């Protein structure tokens, strides 16, 4: 069963599964019913500027929170509608099946390289629901499930551009399916149907394909699950192995083979100067980084040649958001495990790693994330490639910090921990404290994608000892303002407790600064969203970028104090 939330929304109602919340059905249904009844009152009483003002700092995830685009491959291409102008296009799978990975369509989002806080939905680029003859595959017209894709651009001698999409079709006879378009935003049409069978395609690429066109026009493909494969492709087909060459097996050592590489999946390839950089999902060793084994990381290796040999480089991003607790022990400060997939991209001279995170309590509602990184290349044979590890934050492209005077969804939290560590048993995570609940948009979600009434995820299960954090807000925007308060919108859950607002660290012993606090009472209406006003005497004089934390305290253990909806400094 699914419930549709109406709180604070106009055209959008995110869907949250009962199984993704640590709550009783009766309690949840009462909150939902009351929240939906309150829609008219909330919308009318809310200040217009709070609801509709365009965010200058969107946060992380950088796409709207109702959209789920994991496995993102970022590319800078020319805008076909504005020649000479560049846009960043992100191609990923589409988590809309809810109870399993990905979806039966692929869509693309893009943003001007000059305005990375305004992402635009460019529409569906591919659905594979008909064969070469235009016939449905079955009587129901069911489309194929499409996993993590890649895109590459081929420009001919006359300057004509063809974009090739490798959609990672999960139907056995169509694993190697590819499609092409004259535009980066599609639509794409399948171009490698078999001449012998209208339901099959000709092609060697399999799980998680990545394709690269080198400066000399030669084409290379990469793929694999737990073992890595690569091949030089025939440029006339873009799908089959070049005659006279062979598939390279175990291009780098896999998860169960010796060495530090530990390839799992998520092949991606880039060329930076004269070096080839292979990005992939790596299965860490048990105890590595002080945490259990996980494939929730992206790593890289590099070579002087597109097919190797390769030198291991290191970790680019860790989706567990490694931090240290009050005693100095390494912890996962976000979802403890899952998968991730992405790549790196240079935009206006700055490098970023694009990846995804998990939301809810399973791996089927993933969101697009980004972090700045540093890339250094030593040119020449045997030269090194050094890529710094990105930090898991709430900033996204707001590298100077989030604007505290804009209302942000609680769902951009980058730190959510409980009184004891969350656990993972594929494909589910069990949380003993705070986590970001997943939500999905409806057909009207594009009207105002970043409007707070559309763009929100709740943070739920805020039990005693839970911590919810945001890195980072830039408090310089509050300079000169007196009596600054925090307006925090919540749904109380019928127990007494306190929310402590802190900066820099959630622990005073680790130089955390207490900004303010407020009590949540058991007699507060549990069926109504309310806004708390929290005085912040400790904020005086605070400038620059600082992490913000909500620490939950209650004498009632193992029960959630409230849901967090959104907040703004006033």
Predicted segments — roles?
Residues 2, 7, 11-19:
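Short, positively charged and aromatic/hydrophobic N-terminal segments
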Residues 19-20, 567:
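Short hotspots in intrinsically disordered terminal tails
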Residues 46-570:
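Carbohydrate-active catalytic/glycan-binding domains of CAZyme proteins
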Residues 10, 30-32, 45-48:
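Short, intrinsically disordered, low-complexity terminal segments
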Residues 21-31:
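Bacterial N-terminal signal peptides that target proteins for export
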Residues 31-39:
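Bacterial N-terminal signal peptides
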Residues 41-43:
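C-terminal motif of bacterial Sec signal peptides marking the signal peptidase cleavage site
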């Amino acid at each position: 069963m699914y419930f549709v939330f109406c709180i604070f929304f106009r055209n959008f109602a995110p869907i949250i599964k009962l199984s993704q919340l640590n709550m009783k059905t009766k309690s949840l249904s009462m909150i939902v019913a009351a929240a939906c009844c309150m829609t008219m009152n909330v919308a009318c009483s809310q200040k217009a500027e709070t609801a509709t003002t365009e965010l200058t700092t969107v946060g992380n995830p950088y796409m709207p929170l109702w959209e789920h685009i994991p496995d993102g491959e970022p590319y800078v291409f020319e805008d076909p509608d504005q020649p000479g102008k560049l846009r960043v296009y992100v191609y990923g799978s589409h988590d809309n099946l809810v109870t399993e990975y990905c979806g039966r369509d692929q869509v693309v989002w893009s943003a001007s390289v000059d305005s990375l806080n305004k992402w635009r939905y460019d529409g569906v680029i591919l659905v594979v629901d008909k064969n070469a003859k235009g016939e449905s595959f079955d009587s129901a017209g069911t489309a194929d499930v499409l996993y993590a894709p890649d895109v590459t651009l081929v420009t001919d001698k006359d300057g004509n551009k063809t974009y090739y999409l490798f959609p990672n079709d999960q139907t056995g006879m169509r694993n190697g399916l590819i499609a092409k378009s004259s535009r980066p935003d599609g639509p794409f049409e399948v171009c490698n149907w078999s001449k012998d069978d209208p339901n099959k395609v000709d092609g060697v690429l399999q799980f998680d394909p990545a394709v690269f066109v080198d400066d000399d026009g030669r084409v290379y493909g990469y793929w694999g699950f737990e073992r890595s494969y690569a091949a030089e492709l025939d440029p006339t087909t873009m799908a089959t192995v070049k005659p006279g060459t062979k598939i390279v097996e175990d291009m780098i050592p896999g998860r169960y083979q010796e060495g530090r590489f530990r390839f799992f999946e998520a092949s991606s390839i880039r060329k930076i100067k004269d070096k080839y950089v292979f990005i992939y999902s790596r299965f860490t060793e048990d105890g590595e980084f002080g945490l259990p084994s996980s494939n929730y990381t992206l790593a890289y290796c590099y070579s002087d040649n597109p097919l190797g040999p390769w030198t291991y480089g290191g970790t680019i991003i860790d989706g567990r958001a490694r931090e240290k607790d009050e005693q100095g022990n390494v912890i996962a400060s976000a979802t403890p495990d899952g998968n991730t997939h992405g790549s790196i991209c240079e935009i206006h001279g700055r490098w970023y790693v694009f990846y995804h995170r998990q939301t809810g309590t399973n791996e089927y509602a993933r969101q697009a994330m980004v972090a700045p990184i540093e890339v250094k290349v030593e040119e020449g044979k045997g030269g090194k490639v050094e890529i710094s590890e990105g930090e898991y934050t709430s900033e996204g492209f707001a590298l100077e910090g989030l604007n505290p005077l804009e209302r942000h969804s609680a769902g951009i939290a980058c730190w959510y921990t409980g009184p004891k560590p969350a656990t993972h048993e594929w494909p589910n995570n069990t949380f003993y404290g705070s986590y970001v609940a997943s939500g999905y948009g409806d057909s009207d979600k594009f009207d105002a994608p970043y409007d707070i009434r559309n763009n929100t995820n709740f943070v739920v299960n805020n039990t005693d000892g839970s911590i919810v954090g945001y890195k980072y807000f830039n408090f310089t925007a509050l300079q000169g303002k007196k009596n600054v308060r925090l307006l925090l919108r919540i749904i109380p859950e019928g127990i007494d407790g306190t929310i402590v607002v802190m900066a820099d660290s959630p622990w005073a012993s680790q130089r955390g600064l207490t900004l303010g606090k407020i009590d949540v009472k058991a007699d507060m209406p549990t069926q109504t969203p309310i806004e708390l006003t929290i005085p912040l005497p400790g904020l005086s004089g605070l400038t620059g970028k600082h992490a913000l934390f909500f620490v939950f305290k209650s004498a009632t253990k193992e029960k959630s104090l409230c849901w967090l909806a959104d907040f703004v400094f006033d």
